[in-house]
Amino acid sequence: MAARQIWARTGAALCRQPSAAPPPAPLWVRAGFRQQLSLTLCPANEGNCGGSAPSTPGRPERAARPSVSEELTAAERQIAELHAAACAAGQLNYVDPATGYVVLTQIAHLQRGECCGSACRHCPYGQVNVKDPSKKKQFNSYFYV
């Protein structure tokens, strides 16, 4: 008898129709996370990269980075656009058009919480845990190459 009552209660709770309200927006959308993805990143030991501190905490300076077309090749521009689109959609990765590899976005790296040491292209931590200096990459103001 008690088992039937438990089944009736759990069945009613689990089989209930979903509410018509849409799910809440992800945290990075509500907190303005998309704005912070355009920060120019430096290794942690360089402080603020020798420049002045931003006037508003958590907001990048718009004039700190030249336009995409001035400094990147066509392939690098495509990577920057794919990464920006994937981050805007909240995706954790995208496919590199040249190699076919799955590349983690900055969102995926930020969710991890620290540098993994694999010399990732979009590492927001300045590749601080990369052991082999020959594997460290140069930051082109959009991603590591």
From Swiss-Prot:
InterPro entries: DUF5522 (IPR040807). Keywords: Phosphoprotein. The modification Phosphoserine is found at S67. Expressed in retina and retinoblastoma. GO terms for cellular component: mitochondrion. This is Uncharacterized protein C1orf53. It comes from Homo sapiens (Human). The lineage of its organism: Eukaryota, Metazoa, Chordata, Craniata, Vertebrata.
